[in-house]
Amino acid sequence: MFRLFSSGVDDLVLVSNPSNGEVTSQIGARFDRELIYTNIGEVLIAVNPYKALPITGPEFIKLYQNASGSDASPHIYALAERAYRRMVDENESQCVIISGESGAGKTVSAKLILQYVTSVSPNNSSGGGIGGSGGGNGGIPQYDGGSDDRPSPPMGRGMGMPGMVGRGGLPTRGGGPPSRGGGPPPTRGRGGPPPPIPQNRGAPPPVSNGGAPPPVARGPVAPPPTRGAPPTRGGGPANRGGRGGGPPPVSTSRGGGGYGGSSKTVDVEHIKKVILDSNPLMEAIGNAKTVRNDNSSRFGKYLEIQFDDNNAPVGGLISTFLLEKTRVTFQQKNERNFHIFYQMLGGLDQTTKSEWGLTQATDFYYLAQSKCTTVEDVDDGKDFHEVKAAMETVGISRDEQTEIFRILAAILHVGNIRFQGEAPASVIDETPLQWAASLLGCDPTFLCQSLNHRQIQSGSARHTQYQVPQNPDQSAGLRDALAKTLYERIFDFIVARVNKAMSFSGNCKVIGVLDIYGFEVFERNSFEQFCINYVNERLQQIFIDLTVRGEQREYHEEGMKWKDISFFDNKIVVDLIDGNKPPGIMRVLDDVCKTVHAVDSAAADIKFMEKLIHSIQSHPHLVISNTGSSADEFTIKHYAGEVSYSIEEFCFKNNDNLYASIVGCLQNSTYQFIVSLFPENIQDNKQAPTTSSFKIRQSSSYLVTRLSACTPHYIRCIKPNDKKQPMNFVSSRVEHQVKYLGILENIKVKRSGYAYRQLKDIFLNRFGKIMDVQPRNVQEFVEYITRTHKDINADEFEEGKTKIFVKNPETIFVMEDLLMQKIDPIGYKNRVQAYKENEKLAQMKQGKHSMKQKCLIQ
């Protein structure tokens, strides 16, 4: 109705002779006009512009809020509007699945979805309907594709266009070069050793550097902590450190309390603020600079916004998975550790830094090893204060903030501990050990012994505990395990606090937004890329199942005339990785880890490769070029292309052990906050250890279950070039993504199929209101609508066994307008008027940016 301007084909379903090349050309033609969004029916294609575009903001939110599906050109706000309205109209949960490779712009797309939904939803839960006064979110930032170089600030500030790019190099057990023992650069003066630590509560008596620490005896041994149980609407009681106790490796714990209760007691504006302000906090602890992106997400996040019966956001839940813990101890050249370390060094006051022995990033091995400690145009100190403000918003007290930053400071000192000699290894320089012990509230001798001895429990009935001295390499491995464990517990604590601040226990609908690592392939790929790409295979499987296979299956089940369209089914790749019969790669890996977990890591990796060659070498999507004794990599033919994986440390990383000596040391800390982060008891050689691959299979299945319970909406993000160059469209690079994302197959199904389908009763209950008398059946409605409205043809409708199908979306748009005119004529008139006014404002805003481009809204 209001399609005023046209620039190219805004819906690829309209392409006459679709091919991968033609689709790429159409996307490129729009991109050249700074139109970064294109539709495939209801699937949105989003191309990263790597520059700021004035296509977001309050004017555009109002414009899309008041527009029906026929009113607006492709835009992420249009998709967000559709998801929100469907939740309202159909009373069903929705989800937005954002996919694409690293650097394609998934994270900023997720932010824009959240901004739109919090803006258009009511500000209170006691009254409402749809489209309240907005979320009090201040100014909405412009779409910036080229400068996503710091954690996203709260609303009203600038934002960037991140991707999710990983590192190529990976850590060794000793922490990488310059030696297997790990090794920071020579430290500059830090003003002497740290102050004495507080009186240790119950610490063991001091022993010499070379001796064995006393065994940790704290009662029955509990299984290691997992990353939390699947969420429940009720939130559940608080737990120590906010770590859930269920098996799935997804961090979702709410920590209890918060804003739980009925919707009548919920401060909706506070919930909106938590949802938006948690972004810079989550990015600070979960994002990092990589070689291809200055703000790369190094974890997966699924955020569910919970809505009450009045469609107001009354709660939320963040589920996290696949945190890249190895980044704490190793980054490849020109990458950085997680943002929070640099922010802390840049933002803490000098007194606190002196008390904690903090100087500059180049003095700490965990930050200096990559030769990159700063990012252009990023003020880490300024970002630190924004992060602290976000912590206050989510209910992390100032005392708790101090505890968190003290632990982060301790991690930096832990990284500077180096070892030498024979087993048990001795510490080269006591200063970083003293600082780490002081900040962790541990006896320095006990901490040292926890690193140069590993506690083992015998498999006999007596379960005798004994100490195994560690050489420098092994001690460095324990040192890095300590650092990664501390960081993971802090990460989970913060996630739990964010969830506590959004906790809601009433009945609700949700809109979920998935932001996860993109597909990764580098010169050197290891266990991390293997896991990331497996999850992306699962997400691609969901997309294919719901948009291609599922749609064709539905036509057959409904008795429709349909000729199947061929497509690549990546189930064969998923089964290669996680299959049970025959066993997939993960099952083979777990089996090796169970049988040889006490053996040297390198020997375990060799055994893993031998079993791969023996059991699944013949698989059509697995390539093992070298099958001899020196075989050290395998290649998987993924849906997105071939990736070769180095087997080095596959078994070590898959075991992901939590060592008893380390836990025992931290459980004896004088700081109760640290003790609360480690409530469990642990033994090293559990009979059936929980492996990383097992956790990943569980978390991906959990995620698939959550997504499958919602009506899905898809955003397919595309990276136009590999150098982050603004408005540079490399056709060959884009066409490769168009091909492996299955966009062409999706277009063909949409062109041959139906844009809308609904159960007959629901359809008649809604659109039957257009008639003066409720129709008795679909045929009666079709006869009426085609007789009274000449622009609607009878062949637009097809009746299946249980559902009614409509071929073109324009028909639905017309019927929606007719329905609004019938049930709310005044509101419809006001909506049209508001649309026209907002359209003028949007055109004026964009006109200032470019005289050549008339308007995004057509």
From Swiss-Prot:
SMART domains reported in the protein's UniProt record: MYSc (SM00242)
Residues binding ATP: G100, E101, S102, G103, A104, G105, K106, T107
Principal place of residence: cytoplasm
Keyword Lipid biosynthesis set for record: no
Top-rank taxon, per record: Eukaryota
Keywords: Actin-binding, ATP-binding, Cytoplasm, Motor protein, Myosin, Nucleotide-binding
Role, per record: Myosins are actin-based motor molecules with ATPase activity. Involved in phagocytosis and motility, and in the maintenance and dynamics of cell cortex.
Family from the record: Belongs to the TRAFAC class myosin-kinesin ATPase superfamily. Myosin family.
UniProt note: domains: The head domain possess two actin-binding sites, a classic ATP-dependent one and a secondary salt-dependent one (located inside the GPR domain).
This protein's name: Myosin-K heavy chain
The organism of origin for this protein: Dictyostelium discoideum
